[in-house]
């Protein structure tokens, strides 16, 4: 999107009229980025969710279908399972693990513990649970929260880094962001954000602006500014 915007600003825009579909998987694709792409060209944006163990859901955005962040229609045979073993129904206030049935692997090679955690039977049906948590909305779609193993436990509250990252990136001053949990004597863990900027802003102002998008307890306790956010 940045390349398209920069080329257009310089008066030498790319010709992308032949592009019909863009498919994304494995990263958080925000509504703002989708909207920006559609402003350049009318096409289909397919956002897919899955893992090595199996596909789970997808969404398609067009100019006639407003974009959303981390919202997917579920594939057949996919459930959301609460930690207490309840299969969630649309509109439930609980969150749960996403599980997919069908062609489920036998297990991980020489890793019985991980196999038992990931591949389980529910009501006689074998499912794969890679570890992603979601909320099942009243319309039958899910809102993906994030991977349970990445969840930050701060003062007894569960905070998903992906949600905080997307909230911070909604600020026009932010170019990129990565959120992690850091051990803390008071909270157990605290939310820390690593941020690269598009425009100058201080940490206090950025936190205050982000308060419009997420609950206060999810806000970062500390922000580290860097020239570039590095990912392995």
What does each of the following model-derived ranges do?
Residues 112, 122, 168-172:
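Acidic-histidine catalytic/liganding microenvironments
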Residues 223-232:
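Short proline/glycine- and acidic-rich turn/helix-capping motifs at secondary-structure junctions
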Residues 50, 101, 106-107, 117, ...:
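AMP-binding/adenylate-forming catalytic core of the ANL superfamily
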Residues 79-100, 136-139, 199-203:
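Conserved beta-loop-beta connector loops within the AMP-binding
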Residues 7-67, 77-79, 89-90:
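Gly/Ser/Thr-rich phosphate-binding loop
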Residues 16-19, 75, 174, 220:
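Core-facing hydrophobic residues within beta-strands of well-ordered domains
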Residues 46-53, 70-72, 180-183, 224:
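Beta-strand->loop->alpha-helix junctions that form or flank phosphate-binding loops
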Residues 67-73, 118, 124-125:
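Short Gly/Pro-enriched turn/cap motifs at secondary-structure boundaries
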């Amino acid at each position: 999107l940045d390349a398209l915007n920069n080329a257009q600003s310089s008066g030498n825009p790319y010709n992308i009229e032949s592009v019909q579909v863009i498919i994304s998987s494995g990263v958080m694709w925000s509504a703002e980025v989708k909207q920006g792409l559609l402003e350049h060209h009318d096409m289909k944006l397919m956002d897919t969710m899955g893992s090595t163990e199996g596909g789970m859901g997808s969404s398609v955005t067009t100019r006639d279908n407003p974009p959303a962040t981390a919202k997917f229609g579920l594939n057949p045979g996919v459930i959301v399972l609460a930690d207490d073993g309840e299969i969630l129904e649309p509109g439930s206030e609980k969150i749960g693990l996403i599980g997919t049935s069908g062609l489920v692997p036998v297990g991980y090679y020489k890793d019985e513990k991980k196999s038992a955690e990931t591949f389980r039977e529910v009501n006689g049906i074998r499912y794969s649970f890679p570890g992603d948590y979601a909320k099942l909305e009243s319309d039958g779609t899910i809102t993906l929260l994030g991977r349970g193993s990445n969840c930050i436990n701060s003062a007894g509250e569960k905070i998903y880094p992906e949600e905080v990252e997307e909230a911070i990136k909604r600020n026009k001053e932010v170019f990129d962001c990565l959120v992690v949990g850091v051990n803390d004597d008071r909270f157990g863990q605290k939310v820390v954000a690593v941020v690269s900027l598009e425009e100058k802003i201080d940490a206090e102002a950025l936190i205050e602006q982000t308060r419009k998008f997420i609950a206060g307890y999810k806000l970062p306790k500390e922000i580290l500014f860097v020239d570039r956010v590095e990912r392995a």
